[in-house]
Design a protein with these regions (language model features):
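Arg/Lys-rich, alpha-helical DNA-contact motif
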Residues: 13
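Bacterial N-terminal signal peptides that target proteins for export
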Residues: 1-8
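C-terminal motif of bacterial Sec signal peptides marking the signal peptidase cleavage site
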Residues: 16-19
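Cell-envelope/extracellular polymer assembly enzymes that use nucleotide-activated donors
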Residues: 21-275
Length: 275
């Protein structure tokens, strides 16, 4: 192979590898910003309007009612899961704790007092050979399938969320912000052991009432996040890639959201008849 051919081949390989590494360049709207809802400790991005995680109105309740009915037939109590607004969503801690006011109230952990789910093992059945939990979960699932189609989340939403996050994956920016955050918490007496955690938090037990030490550690982490602007800058970057994607794919997003709601509506009558 001549020197020229070798040079051209190397250039071609370099181009292919470059494309594989970074993927297609997406449109970016520099004006887009993530919304930081401090009261609810949530970060809201443009695509979130189409995120169906935790937003079914009837299906989950119908499934839980079917389970409860089955347990009652076996003379056992079943504590139903009560879904709260937005349950199941990413609450905005991808880049660490950022909400100082929330950290002052709840420490390192999220407040989840409005969700109830009894995960304890049920009492033994009157029939020693029967696993009531397994039977009732399967029966409830089968009953739901007979009623209608299970509401699933939007495939378009998932794809666009992944595309935007990949496009926003500026590792140089993230590393710079991570390093600044680590220096900040270290200057305040903590020992960073990852990009979002400190060594001192490992021995803090999760409890309904956070200790003074837990609150101190959480506040330092959140304050450093705000001082450095880590969550703000990285979520803003995601929002800037999400906004044009939403505009270009709005019809598909709207249609899949309508389909989700249509499927969920099929379980309304079951809820009304059994609650």
């Amino acid at each position: 192979m001549s020197a020229l051919k070798k040079l051209l081949a190397a250039a071609l390989i370099s181009t292919v590898l470059s494309f594989c590494s970074f993927g297609p360049t997406l449109e970016k709207d520099e004006s887009a910003r993530a919304i930081f809802d401090a009261e609810n400790d949530q970060v809201i991005l443009p695509l979130d309007a189409y995120n169906t995680d935790g937003k079914d109105e009837y299906f989950t309740k119908a499934l839980e009612l079917a389970r409860k009915k089955c347990f009652a037939e076996h003379g056992q109590h079943y504590k139903m899961f009560v879904r709260t607004e937005g349950a199941g969503r990413n609450f905005g801690r991808t880049y660490g704790i950022w909400n100082v006011e929330y950290a002052q109230k709840y420490g390192l952990h999220k407040s989840d007092d409005s969700n109830t789910l009894d995960l304890s093992s049920p009492a033994p059945s009157s029939d020693p050979g029967k696993d009531v939990s397994t039977e009732c979960y399967q029966r409830a699932s089968d009953e739901m399938k007979q009623i209608g189609e299970i509401p699933f989340g939007s495939a378009t939403y998932r794809r666009l969320e992944t595309d935007a996050r990949n496009a926003a994956g500026d590792q140089q920016l993230k590393k710079s912000l991570d390093d600044e955050w680590k220096r900040c918490v270290k200057d305040k007496g903590l020992t960073p052991d990852s990009e979002v955690t400190v060594k001192e938090s490992k021995n803090i037990p999760q409890s309904a009432t956070p200790s003074e030490e837990e609150i101190r550690i959480a506040v330092i982490q959140a304050q450093c996040n705000q001082d450095v602007g880590r969550s703000q800058k990285l979520y803003d970057l995601e929002a800037q890639y999400q906004k044009p994607l939403v505009a270009k794919n709005q019809a598909a997003l709207e249609n899949e959201l309508k389909e989700f709601k249509r499927r969920d509506e099929q379980f309304k009558q079951y809820v009304l008849d059994n609650q």
